[in-house]
Regions:
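Glycine-rich phosphate-binding loops of nucleotide-dependent enzymes
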Residues: 1-182
Length: 182
């Protein structure tokens, strides 16, 4: 990936097998964030460069294209609406169940949110505002939302500095959740 006057990524390749967890480590300015942003569709790769997954070539030039390829991204700032509940935050990612016609089926929404968080190891009251959750649980909500944004299987889940603002106990809890994803 080239920006005006600067090469940010050159001949970057890496392989990820199903169930693996990887961390990008490197000096400031080494291209970690640029690689993540290219994979997530926030930056277009230079012409002639693309992403290959499972022998399928993807032209990742937008967030929509990254989603179509099964790539999900959780920002460092999480993008949660702290004043509303976990149920509502998750529904922002995958839409509301309106099986009651035009009315939202809150019982179904609550059940779906509860299960999504339990799958990650977070047994929390999904009806309370996100502002009252701890750091690891908030990150868990963001991960659950990313995982449920579509019916397509997720190929890659990218977490941008997920432990940056977490105390030690929350880091351990988050790593437990990531291990459950394997």
């Amino acid at each position: 990936k080239t920006f005006p006057g600067q090469v940010a990524l050159q001949d970057a390749t890496f392989d990820v097998e199903e169930g693996e967890v990887h961390a990008l480590v490197g000096q400031n300015g080494s291209g970690k964030s640029t690689l993540i942003k290219v994979l997530a569709g926030f930056h277009q790769p230079d012409p002639g460069h693309n992403v290959t997954m499972n022998d399928e070539v993807f032209d990742i030039g937008s967030v929509e294209a990254a989603h179509a390829a099964g790539i999900r991204f959780v920002h460092q700032d999480l993008g949660l609406v702290e004043a509303v509940s976990t149920v509502e935050n998750l529904a922002l990612g995958f839409g509301y169940d309106t099986s009651f016609g035009r009315r939202i089926n809150w019982a179904a929404e609550t059940k779906r949110a509860k299960q999504a968080l339990l799958d990650l190891g977070f047994d929390i009251d999904v009806r309370v505002p996100v502002a009252f959750l701890g750091g690891a649980a908030r990150t868990g909500v963001a991960i659950a939302r990313a995982l449920q944004e579509s019916d397509r299987n997720i190929s890659i889940l990218i977490l941008d500095e997920p432990t940056a603002n977490l105390p030690g106990a929350d880091v351990d809890r988050l790593f437990d959740a990531v291990r459950r994803l394997k």
